[in-house]
Amino acid sequence: MRRRQLSFADGLIAEEVSDLRDGWMEHADAVLADEAIVSAVYEALAKRHPKSRSRGRHGTPAEVVLRLLILKHVRNWSYEVLEREVRANLVYRDFTGVGGAKMPDAKTMGRWGVALGPEVIKQVHERLVQIARAKGVTAGRRMRVDTTVVETDIHHPTDSSLMGDGVRVLTRIMRKITQIAGAVGTKLRDRSRSVKLRLLEIGRVARAKGPINQEKLKQRYARLLDTTSRVVGQARRFSDEIGRRVKRSKEILKQLALDGLRQELDLMIPRVRQVMKQTRARIFRGNTRSEGKLLSLFEPSTEVIRKGKAGRPNEFGKMVKLQEAENQIITDYQVYAQRPHDSDLLVAAIETHQALLGRAPRLVAADAAFYSLKNEAAAKAKGVKRVCIPNRSTRSAERKREQRKRWFRDGQKWRTGSEGRISVVKRRHGLDRCRYKGYVGMNRWVGLGVIADNVVNIGRALERQAIP
C-alpha cells in the first residue's frame, strides 16, 4: 500500500501558499494525482530491490518522486539546484508534496530518475495525453510533426582530442590500480605530459595551411599515435595481470575494486583503438566519411547529424521526433538509435496518433522533408482528409495550384508552430543538450522534458477553460 505524504494542507498556511502558485500549477496538480500515473511510478520504484515493499524504511511517496522530477525539468535545473530551491521555497514544497518533510538529497533524486527508466516515463507521457483528450484540451483533429537533434554532453570531437581523452582515462585507471596493488608486475609509465605536448603541436600546425604544413601535421599525428599505442599496450598488460592475479589485494573490497577497474580498462581500450584506427584512415588515407565514427569515448552512441543549418552545420547527438496536436500538446516523441530519413516517419506518426487519440487527424502538416507520393497516398488511406506537406521539387502545375490554396497555406502556417515548440522545449526544458548518460539516459531526458512541457500546457489550457 502506498504511503501518503503530509502536506501544507494539514497545517495552517495552505491557503496562503496556494495563492502564490503559478496559474498552471493548480490544474496540473489535479492531473498529476491521476491514479494510473502514480501507480506506474510506484511499481517502478518497488522493483529496485526484490523486497522493496516489505523491508527497509519507508520510501518517499511515488507522488512526490514524480513531481520532483517533473519540476526539475519544468525549470531545467540540476538535481543540486532542485534540492536547494525546493528546500527554501514553500510553493515548490506544496506543489511537489514534500510539505514540511525533509527534502531528499540530490543523489537520492538521481537514483529515482534512473529507477523509473524510459519505459515508465513513456507510460506516464501516454497517460497524460489521454487525460488531455478526456478533459478536452486536445481532440486530435490536427497533427504536425518535425524532427530535431538533441546533443549529447560532449566536447567538439577531433581525432587528437579523442586520443588525448583516451590516454588521460587509461592513465587515471592504471594509477588507481597501482595505488591498490602496489609496485608489482608492469610499472606505470605516465605519458600524459608527452601527449599534452603532442596535442599542442597538432593544434598549432593545424591552424596553418599549405602542403608543407600538411606533412608536418602527419608527422605530429604519427608521434601522437605512437604514444597512444604505447599507453594502450600498457593498459592491456595491466588488465591481463589483474586477471592472472599478478596485481591483486588481500582485502576483499580492494580486490573487488581492482576487478571493477579491470572492467573499465576492458571497456575503454577498444574505444581508444577505434579512435586510433579512424585517425589513421583520415590522416594517412584521406578517408573523411563520418559513418560509424566514434565521436566520444564516454558517449559512444553519439552521431554526427547535418540538418542544413547555416550556423551549426554539424550537430553531435541523437535524432528526436516530436509530434503535436491542438493546444501545443506533444502527443508522441521518439529518440532514434540510428538517424532515419524524415520521409520514413510520417506513416508511423499517423498510426501513433490514431492509437493515442482514437481517430485519424483531419489535417497532417509537416515540412518538405516528410514528403513523398507514397506517404501522401498512405496518409489519405488512413483517413487523413488534408495532407499539408509541400513538394518543393514538383514541376506539376496542378500540384503548384494545390499548394497555393488557402487551406494549404493555413496548414503550413500552423506547421511552423512545431519549430516554435522545439525552440521552447530546448530553451525552457533543456532539450538542447542531454545531461544524462547513454542512449537510455537520452530517452529519459527527452521523455521528462516532453512531460514537463505537456504538464505546463495542459495546466494553462485548463486554466483558460475555467475562466467564465
Give the role of each language-model region.
Residues M25-I70, V74:
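Basic, short loop/linker segments at the boundary and entry of helix-turn-helix/winged-helix-like folds
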Residues G99-S301:
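Active-site- or DNA-interface-adjacent structural scaffold in DNA-acting proteins
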Residues L363, A368-V440:
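Helix-centered, glycine/charged polyanion-binding patches within enzymatic domains
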Residues M1-E43, K277, R282, I458-P468:
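Charged, often Cys/His-bearing segments associated with DNA-binding zinc-finger transcription factors
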Residues L68, L82, D146, L322, ...:
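Mobile genetic element proteins and their domesticated derivatives, centered on retroelements
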Residues K307-G311, Q334-H341, R406-K413, K437-G441:
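Short, contiguous acidic/charged loop-to-helix segments that flank catalytic cores in large enzymes
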Residues R4, P50-V64, V74-V114, M143:
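Trp/Phe/Arg-rich N-terminal binding region typifying the photolyase-homology
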Residues S301, K309-L356:
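Electropositive, glycine- and tryptophan-enriched low-complexity nucleic-acid-binding patches
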